C-alpha cells in the first residue's frame, strides 16, 4: 500500500508561494497512483501533482493530497528510427538530456530551466523562443493519463484525440499524466551570439531578426533605450564558453543583488542600475557554443516575481512601446531588467497561449534581493492592462489576475476544454484555488 507523509511544507523555487498538504505522496508505480486516487475519492479530498516546483504561482498548491511524481522518472522506450522517446511523467529534463545524448537525440527546443518535470513542462505551456518552433508541448506525440476514477487513457492524434488536444497543456486538472512520448531530433550544437542594440533598431527590424536567427530573442532594459539581442543557431564549432566568474557572479549576481536591495529604499536607483549593468555586462559582443540543451538552459540565480503573456506577434512593437511610454509617464513605477521578448509558432492545443497564432511572449520581472519583496503592484497592473489591450494570454505557470470571464474571451476553445475537464473529473478532484478562478 502506498505510504503518505503528513506535516510536509511545500514551497515553490522562488519561495513566493507555498502550502501545507494534508498528505504528501511519492508513488513509484501506476498502481500506487491509482491507490492515492481511490483514497481521495473515498475521503472526498482534492489532489494536486507537483513537479519541480518552479512555477511562480500557486498552480500546484493544495491543502488536500499532494503527489510528487519524482520516483516515476524512467525512460521506458527509445525509438531511434522515429526519433521518439517515451518517459515516465516525473522525469526531470535535467536527467533526460544526458539519456538523449547517449542515443544521439535532442529536443528541438527547451525552456531556460531543466530542473522541471516533463509533465509539468507540457502542462503549464512552457516555451522558449523561435518563430519556427512551438511551445514545448508541441513536441508531444502521445501520452497516458489517469482520470479521477482510476481509468488510464492512451492519448494521441489517433486515440482519444479530443483529450490529447486538451491534455498537452493540461494545467494539472484533467488527471495525472503517467507517460509522455516526445518527438525528438538528431543531436545538434548551437552557437549563441549576443550583441548590444537599441529598442528602436530591434523593433524597426523585427522581421529581419526573426529571419536571421532560428532562435532569436532580445532583452530590453527598462528606463533606457538599451537592448541585448541574442541569436542561437546550429553550428559545427567546438564547444566554447564566454562565462567568467567575476563578471557572472561577483558583478552579475552579488553586486547586483546588493544594489537592488539598496534600491528598495531608493527606488530612483533602479534606472541607474539598469543602465550600469547593461554597460558592464551586455555592451559587447559575446559568443559561445555547445550541445543544444547546454545553450538553451541557464542558471536562474535570483528569486523573483514574474509575469509572461503571449500577444499576437504583429503587436510586438506597439505593445512594447506602450509599456515604455507607461514607465516614462509614471516615474515612480520602477522596473527591473530585463523585459525578455521571445517568439513562438502558433499551434492547435486548446489552452495553449499560442493557440492559432504566432506569438510574442513579453516577460517582466521583479527580483527579490535577499528574499525581500519589492513593490510591484503598479507595474504589474499596468503591464496586464497593456497585454489585455493587445489580445494577450498569460503564461499558465506564472501569476496573473485573470478569471473565467477573461479566459472565455481569450480562448475560442475554452468551453471545449471545460467540457473535457468536467467529463474526466466530474467532482473537481484536481481543482485548487488557482484553477477555480480559471473555471468558475
From Swiss-Prot:
Q: Which reaction does it catalyse?
A: L-gulono-1,4-lactone + O2 = L-ascorbate + H2O2 + H(+)
InterPro entries for the chain: ALO_C (IPR007173), FAD-bd_PCMH (IPR016166), FAD-bd_PCMH-like_sf (IPR036318), FAD-bd_PCMH_sub1 (IPR016167), FAD-bd_PCMH_sub2 (IPR016169), FAD_lactone_oxidase-like (IPR010031), Oxid_FAD_bind_N (IPR006094), Oxy_OxRdtase_FAD_BS (IPR006093)
Q: Recorded E.C. number(s)? A: 1.1.3.8
What's a Pfam family this protein contains? ALO
Q: Where in the cell is it found?
A: Microsome membrane; Endoplasmic reticulum membrane
Family to which the UniProt record says this protein belongs: Belongs to the oxygen-dependent FAD-linked oxidoreductase family.
Q: Name one GO molecular function term.
A: FAD binding
| Summary of the function given for this chain in its UniProt record | Oxidizes L-gulono-1,4-lactone to hydrogen peroxide and L-xylo-hexulonolactone which spontaneously isomerizes to L-ascorbate.
Please verify whether the record's keywords include Manganese: no
Q: What is this entry's stated membrane topology?
A: Single-pass membrane protein
Originating organism? Rattus norvegicus
Q: Which GO terms describe its biological process?
A: L-ascorbic acid biosynthetic process
Protein known as:
L-gulonolactone oxidase
For the modification Pros-8alpha-FAD histidine, which residues carry it?
A: 54
- GO cellular component labels: endoplasmic reticulum membrane
Annotated pathway = Cofactor biosynthesis; L-ascorbate biosynthesis via UDP-alpha-D-glucuronate pathway; L-ascorbate from UDP-alpha-D-glucuronate: step 4/4
Which cofactor is essential here? FAD
Keyword line: Ascorbate biosynthesis, Endoplasmic reticulum, FAD, Flavoprotein, Membrane, Microsome, Oxidoreductase, Transmembrane, Transmembrane helix
Which ranges does the record mark as transmembrane? 251-273
Residues in domain FAD-binding PCMH-type?
A: 17-187
Amino acid at each position: 500500500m502506498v505510504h503518505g507523509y503528513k506535516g510536509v511544507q511545500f514551497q515553490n523555487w522562488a519561495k513566493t508561494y507555498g502550502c501545507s498538504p494534508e498528505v504528501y505522496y511519492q508513488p513509484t508505480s501506476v498502481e500506487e497512483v491509482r491507490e492515492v486516487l481511490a483514497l481521495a475519492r473515498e475521503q472526498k479530498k482534492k489532489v494536486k501533482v507537483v513537479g519541480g516546483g518552479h512555477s511562480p504561482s500557486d498552480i500546484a498548491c493544495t491543502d488536500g493530497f499532494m503527489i510528487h511524481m519524482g520516483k516515476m522518472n524512467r525512460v521506458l522506450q527509445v525509438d531511434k528510427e522515429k526519433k521518439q522517446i517515451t518517459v515516465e511523467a516525473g522525469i526531470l529534463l535535467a536527467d533526460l538530456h544526458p539519456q538523449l545524448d547517449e542515443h544521439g537525440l535532442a529536443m528541438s527546443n527547451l525552456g531556460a530551466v531543466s530542473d522541471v518535470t516533463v509533465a509539468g513542462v507540457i502542462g503549464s505551456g512552457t516555451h522558449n523562443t523561435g518563430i519556427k518552433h512551438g511551445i514545448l508541448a508541441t513536441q508531444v506525440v502521445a501520452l497516458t493519463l489517469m482520470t479521477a476514477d482510476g481509468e488510464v487513457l492512451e492519448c494521441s492524434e489517433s486515440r482519444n484525440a479530443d483529450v490529447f488536444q486538451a491534455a498537452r497543456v493540461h494545467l494539472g486538472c484533467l488527471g495525472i499524466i503517467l507517460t509522455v512520448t516526445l518527438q525528438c531530433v538528431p543531436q545538434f550544437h548551437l552557437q549563441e551570439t549576443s550583441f548590444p542594440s537599441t529598442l528602436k533598431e530591434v523593433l524597426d527590424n523585427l522581421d529581419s531578426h526573426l529571419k536571421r536567427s532560428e532562435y532569436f530573442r532580445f532583452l530590453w532594459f527598462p528606463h533606457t533605450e538599451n537592448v541585448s539581442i541574442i541569436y542561437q543557431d546550429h553550428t559545427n564549432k567546438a564547444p566554447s564558453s564566454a562565462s567568467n566568474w567575476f563578471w557572472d557572479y561577483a558583478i552579475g549576481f552579488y553586486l547586483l543583488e546588493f544594489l537592488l536591495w539598496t534600491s528598495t529604499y531608493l527606488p530612483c536607483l533602479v534606472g541607474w542600475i539598469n543602465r550600469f549593468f547593461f554597460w558592464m555586462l551586455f555592451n559587447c559582443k559575446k559568443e559561445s557554443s555547445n550541445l543544444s540543451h547546454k545553450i538553451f538552459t541557464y542558471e536562474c540565480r535570483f528569486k523573483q516575481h514574474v509575469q509572461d503573456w503571449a500577444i499576437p506577434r504583429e503587436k510586438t512593437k506597439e505593445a512594447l512601446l506602450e509599456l515604455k511610454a507607461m514607465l516614462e509617464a509614471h516615474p515612480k513605477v520602477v522596473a527591473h531588467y530585463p523585459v525578455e521578448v521571445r517568439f513562438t509558432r502558433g499551434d492547435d492545443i486548446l489552452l495553449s497561449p499560442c493557440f492559432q497564432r504566432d506569438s510574442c511572449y513579453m516577460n517582466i520581472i521583479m527580483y527579490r534581493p535577499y528574499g525581500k519583496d519589492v513593490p510591484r503592484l503598479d507595474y504589474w497592473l499596468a503591464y496586464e492592462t497593456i497585454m489585455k489591450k493587445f489580445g494577450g494570454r498569460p503564461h499558465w505557470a506564472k501569476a496573473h489576475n485573470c478569471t473565467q470571464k477573461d479566459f472565455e474571451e481569450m480562448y475560442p476553445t475554452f468551453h471545449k476544454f471545460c467540457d473535457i475537464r468536467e467529463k474526466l473529473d466530474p467532482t473537481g478532484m484536481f481543482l485548487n484555488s488557482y484553477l477555480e478562478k480559471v473555471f468558475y
